[in-house]
Amino acid sequence: MEQSKGSASQLAFVYVGTVVGAGFATGREIVEFFLKFGWFGFFGILVSGGMFTLLGAKLMIISKRINAKSYQEMNIFLFGATAGRIINVFMLFVLLGVTSVMLSGAGALFEEQLGMSAQIGMLITIGLSLIVMTRGVKGIFGVNVFVVPLLIIFSMIVVADSFIFSESRNAAQWVWPHRWDWLLSAVSYGALNLSLAQAVLVPLANEMSSEKVIKKGALIGGTMLTIVLSASFLSLSTLPDVFLYDIPMAQVVYLFARSVHLIYLLIIFGEVFTSVIGNLYGLEKQVQSFLPVKSKYIFAAIMITAYITSQIGYGRLISTIYPLFGYVSLAFIGALLCKKAPRRRSL
């Protein structure tokens, strides 16, 4: 990315890697936002996938046209100076909360799947994150390009094995949800992830050579996200008592595709790790704009705060924080829908 303009495939992989974090890769987000509505949740996945493709493209095109260097400039463009600054403060707390969720997810991974202390998992993640952030953002894009294809391949393997070897089909049923709750949940999921992804997508758009590349990258990325979401949904629908697990997808892999269990756990950790690093980068840039302190102190303060918050527990954080963030993010999606993209800059 740094040596030349990015390609559509690079953009797509980073897009997927930005959206796919602890909740997505472990299956908790799929359970909370989609599977609990039965097969109506599958239609919700298609709605979210459409949002990732269309609104993701619009977000990045606007960013390129206004030459936004950070999501703060994007929010000021969408909401105006006063409201934009308020939204930016809100985003500061959102990114901090999501970082706590990612840390808690790492702890749950070590505890539930490896039999180790959750505290060890969180501290290892914190240590690795701080080490990487001393080198800047050079490795962020490379990690996504490496991890995302593996995630897609293993998702396909797991969904195939789970349907071959499982006798359960009870997790997803034709249950009639209350009114349009499944649709609101799907839109909320898309809004949440798009509003968070702007921390990476907004500056990334200026790494692309043209709007054509952006549109193609958004299409590929949105399609890949829809495929991975669908595969995870179908796999989880075969797991008995799916709602009892903090990391249900890892349980599916363990039961029906045991040969790739440890590799999939590594992929989950990779997604958690890249999400933590991305959030750290976005938070540090925002804090630096109003508090000129050395980066290492900001990183340390962020991780200490996130570590304390993560003690609430991964499952509880996902169930309460994510839906709340999603509903508030609807304002961001509404502004993105209503705001007209500025004219293309003349060459």
From Swiss-Prot:
It is a multi-pass membrane protein. It comes from the Bacteria. Keywords: Cell membrane, Membrane, Transmembrane, Transmembrane helix. It is found in: Cell membrane. InterPro entries: YkvI. The chain crosses the membrane at residues 6-26, 37-57, 90-110, 114-134, 140-160, 182-202, 217-237, 262-282, 289-309, 317-337. Signal peptide: none annotated. GO terms for cellular component: plasma membrane. This is Uncharacterized membrane protein YkvI. It comes from Bacillus subtilis (strain 168). The gene is ykvI.
